[in-house]
Every structure is written in structure tokens, then in C-alpha cells.
């Protein structure tokens, strides 16, 4: 596998980073979640993702919002979804970054998400057998998530 570099250079003294590789989640859901989580404090981001998993707070979909239903409440836009699977995977990557910050000796209560992004991973190619000896492709896309946490004062 190729070495994946971080998109943003950060000072290693006051930052902690983590990466989730080849996650089997929707690319569109990951893009919308990363846009929403960027710049949040870590505790607020974890609470937000837990509310999304519990179907209490929808994630506003601003780019991939064709044929989406309206959601009640203040979400910043009319349409939104509850991407539970993507939220769970991103929550695990954030937990890993928090543990990396603890290992470095950073104050975990004063961490904010400096950078979070999703990149396209490789495609797992599979085939579904059909009638009369044919086969249809059944491909699974994967993505990579990058997280950089920064200690603020």
C-alpha cells in the first residue's frame, strides 16, 4: 500500500493526529460529516456524533442534497440525514487521536479539530453471478479519514 501523507503540516509539539484507512463507509456521508466537524472542540464533536448515532440531530447535507427530505429544528439548512455508520467510524478515529494526544501529554480538554478530511481509498472489486453465465460488478468503495487535533489556549 502507498504511504499516505497528511494534507496539512502541523507543529508536532501541540498537535496530535490519527488516520483511519480503508473505511467502508459512504464517501458522500464522510464529506458532509468532515465539513460539519471541522473547527469544533473535541468534546463537542464527540457529543455531536453521539447525537447523530442516536438519531437526535441530523447532519446538514449542503453538497449532496438531491432528493433529501426536510428535517425539523435548526440544522443550518433544510435537508439532512443521520449517517450512523460514518459517524461511528469517525468517532473511532477521533478517539484514537485523543489517545495519541494523551500519550503526548497534551491537555485533552483543550483540544479542537484543526483539520479533518476524507480521501478516496481503493475500490474492492467483487462480482455478483447472474443468470445465463453473466456477472455484474459489485464494487465497494473505501475512504481514508485524516484528523489533526490542536491544543488551544
Curated annotation (Swiss-Prot):
InterPro entries xref list: Ribosomal_uL22, Ribosomal_uL22_CS, Ribosomal_uL22_euk/arc, Ribosomal_uL22_sf
A single GO BP term for this record reads:
cytoplasmic translation
Which GO terms label this protein's molecular function in UniProt? Answer: rRNA binding; structural constituent of ribosome
Write down the superkingdom of origin.
Archaea
Q: Which Pfam families match?
A: Ribosomal_L22 (PF00237)
The residues that cross the membrane are none
Tell me the keywords, alphabetical order: Ribonucleoprotein, Ribosomal protein, RNA-binding, rRNA-binding
**What's one GO-annotated cellular component?**
cytosolic large ribosomal subunit
**Mind telling me which PROSITE patterns this protein's record contains?**
RIBOSOMAL_L22
Q: Which PANTHER family does UniProt cross-reference here?
A: 60S RIBOSOMAL PROTEIN L17 (PTHR11593:SF10)
Q: NCBIfam families this protein is in? A: PRK04223.1, uL22_arch_euk
Quaternary data: Part of the 50S ribosomal subunit.
Q: What family is this?
A: Belongs to the universal ribosomal protein uL22 family.
Q: What does this protein do?
A: This protein binds specifically to 23S rRNA. It makes multiple contacts with different domains of the 23S rRNA in the assembled 50S subunit and ribosome. The globular domain of the protein is located near the polypeptide exit tunnel on the outside of the subunit, while an extended beta-hairpin is found that lines the wall of the exit tunnel in the center of the 70S ribosome.
Protein name stated in the entry: Large ribosomal subunit protein uL22
Which species is the source of this protein? Answer: Methanococcus maripaludis (strain C5 / ATCC BAA-1333)
